[in-house]
Structures are given as C-alpha cells and as structure tokens.
C-alpha cells in the first residue's frame, strides 16, 4: 500500500492522507507477470525523478497507480516510459488528469441513465485529449 501524505495545516503533529493506493495481492514464489511488471517500474534504477524524496515518492506512487488502473487509458505505457517524470509540475498535471479519468470511468460503470452516461463519456473524452496533449 502507498499513500500521498502531508502535514495537517492546523496541527503540525498530525498527518493527512490525500490519496491512498492498495495494490493487488501477489503470491510470493509463484511467477506472475503483473507483479514482475510492477516491480520493474518501481525499481530504483528505473525511477527518473530523484531530485528529492517527495518527488521520488510521488513518482513511485503514481506509477503504481497507473499500473493498477492501466485499463483506463490505452497509452498508459507511454506515460510510464516517458520523460515527463523529470518535470514535477507536468507530472502533477498528468497524474491529476489520470486520476480524474479513472474516477470518471468508475462512475460510468455505475451510471444508470443515458444522460449521465453521455455526460461522463464527454468528460472521459476531454480527459483523454488533455492527456494526449501532455504526452511527448
């Protein structure tokens, strides 16, 4: 499990969890391509932004998040392998849009009316266009 945390703004002795992620369970000793893929992307040598601990951990968190939700966006591999991880601001924008895309896709599954589905599909299309414009 991973989480993006920060100090509470009113009480410096408390920590606030902004986002959390629980990865899938993987059996130890049993070959698993998904586990191997996750571990390869989270390998220290493959992580790109090692400027400070915060950016390093955020890259770790968001790569794990993207791998857990890679069905949400067809070009997730391009995002994971791209060089946008060197730029903290760009990474934050991309990851925020990716989280919104995953949220909209989840809400689309539970939508009942066609009006809701159409609205969510428009939002999904917009998020995908933004992600594609951020890619290199």
Model-derived regions, located:
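Alpha-helical oligomerization segments
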Residues: 69, 77, 81-82, 88-136
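Selected N-terminal structured segments and early membrane-anchoring regions
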Residues: 1-78
